[in-house]
A protein has these predicted regions:
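Short arginine-rich
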Residues: 66-76
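Hydrophobic beta-strand residues in large extracellular and virion-surface proteins
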Residues: 9, 21-22, 33-35, 53, ...
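Short intrinsically disordered terminal tails
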Residues: 1, 77-80
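N-terminal acidic leader/helix
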Residues: 4-21, 25
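A short, exposed loop/beta-hairpin motif centered on an aromatic-Gly-Thr core
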Residues: 44-61
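Short aromatic-glycine-(Arg/Gly/Cys) micro-motifs in beta-strand/loop hairpins
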Residues: 20-48
Length: 80
């Protein structure tokens, strides 16, 4: 796979600690959302996915829905 173009990164935090980082990368033929999840009792982040989509629109929709869920759960989500 060739180097992709990073489209955006979203960083979710709750109570001053990282909860998740979502990164969308466009590879031309597909768009991939890479995620890092920070469990409460873990010393390091866990990787979930990657989640592969046909285009940036689908990847953006996935991240938008994930961000909405994180906000509903009380997280602050910011562009990173």
């Amino acid at each position: 796979m060739t180097a992709g173009k990073e489209l955006f990164v979203r960083h979710a935090r709750k109570d001053c600690r990282s909860v998740a980082i979502l990164r969308a990368v466009d590879y031309g033929q597909e768009c991939v959302v890479e995620t890092e999840v920070f469990p409460p009792d873990a010393a390091t982040a866990m990787r979930a996915g990657p989640y592969t989509f046909a285009d940036a629109r689908q990847a953006t929709q996935f991240v938008t829905e994930a961000v909405e869920a994180l906000m509903y759960l009380g997280c602050d989500v910011h562009a990173a």
